[in-house]
């Protein structure tokens, strides 16, 4: 079932923005929490190599979706969304929301509550495993952030209710 939903979501995103697999995540990350971040930070979020992220940034820049902004000292370069990039990031999020809403529409309220509880448990397990993998891996292979496509308003991050952050915090305290 998860593959069906993932395939539908990918198709919906591709219909809105035929930019490949990593571009929607880059636009979402820049829109939600990383606007003005560096290529290195974006690379970390996406789980791409630095050179792969540079190529992605070049491609998104050529499409007029992002631009590089240099710092006053000329050393640091930030990646920011253009107004066009911001609009596309919102359309991508709306396509994802519509697809997910459609997939969940046949569930009753009780079924939705049960699914939410099960997904919360699964997310906590996956998040803790990811933290343990990163701690054990001395090479620190790039791994994409779990939140790279997150809608922060929906997850409750601004109120301190981000399930991924809570799982990591709980894991750190145990």
Regions found by a protein language model. Give the residues of each.
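Charged, amphipathic alpha-helical coiled-coil/dimerization segments
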Residues: 58-113
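N-terminal helix-turn-helix DNA-binding core of bacterial DNA-binding proteins
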Residues: 10-51, 63, 162
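Residue-level marker of regulatory loop/turn positions in helix-turn-helix DNA-binding domains and
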Residues: 19, 92, 139
